[in-house]
């Protein structure tokens, strides 16, 4: 994973602070989402990877927050 994608994860994770997970836990959940996005992304679609990845990152972070509660 390159630095730009890591910055994307950090940016998305920032919106979920103070919801029960530490910053490190949010980043870890976001990285899982980024991995899923990389596995499932089909480059021949009209969707840009960044838009696709944000959805996966958010879903994994939300799920981690739900699992913690």
Named regions from a protein language model:
Residues 1-69:
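Alpha-helical promoter-recognition and RNA polymerase-docking modules of transcription initiation factors
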């Amino acid at each position: 994973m390159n630095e730009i994608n890591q910055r994307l994860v950090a940016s998305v994770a920032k919106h979920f602070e103070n919801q029960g997970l530490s910053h490190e836990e949010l980043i870890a959940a976001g990285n899982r989402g980024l991995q899923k996005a990389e596995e499932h992304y089909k480059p021949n679609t009209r969707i840009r990877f960044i838009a696709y990845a944000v959805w996966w990152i958010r879903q994994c972070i939300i799920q981690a927050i739900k699992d913690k509660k």
